[in-house]
Amino acid sequence: MKRIYLLSLWLLACLVLPMKGQAVSQADLLNAEQFEHIDSSADSGRGDGKYLDLSSVKPLTAPNGHRRIEAVIYVSMPAANMIQGLSVQYDYQMNRSLRHLINAHDQALKQGNKIPYISIWRTKQGNSGITGTVNAGGTYYNNGQNRQQRIYAENLKAMILPAEFGDEKYKLPNLLYQKAYGIAYDDET
């Protein structure tokens, strides 16, 4: 029984549930009123990259000390005639924001602890305080028609997860946080 349970968990990690919602085309993604292009060093400048559906950014209820945000991200790959839509949710631990860690470090210094400032950076790199999950996904052709193709967990890791501090994938959840709450996650106390 345990083996069946572990096998089913492994299969879920490889597959993403179908995304509910509208298919989008490459032309739709270029509508700056509805979608925001998220700059990336991997972009070629030919319409590829990540796009945030601005109407999908929603704060969710979360346990004390956390904040949660849900949004839809589209990853455009025009050369492959493919757009992947991902419904994502990010959980933010408020005690892991950079401002909170700096304040805690300064408090420790006042109490006589001689901890170097680089420890803040190392602490943040060890745990960014942001956990992302993909709730659903869909794949489309550049013209917006549905494409029957699965989204695999290893592709998600390359595109958006995990949100590691100092990594380009850290930019997306911070942008979502700022859109939802009007302040950068790392500026929260």
Which residue ranges define each predicted feature?
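Amphipathic/hydrophobic helical signal segments and adjacent flexible N-terminal regions
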Residues: 2, 17, 22-23
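N-terminal secretory-pathway/extracellular module detecting exported/lumenal segments
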Residues: 22-86, 91-189
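Bacterial N-terminal signal peptides that target proteins for export
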Residues: 1-8
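Bacterial N-terminal signal peptides
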Residues: 8-16
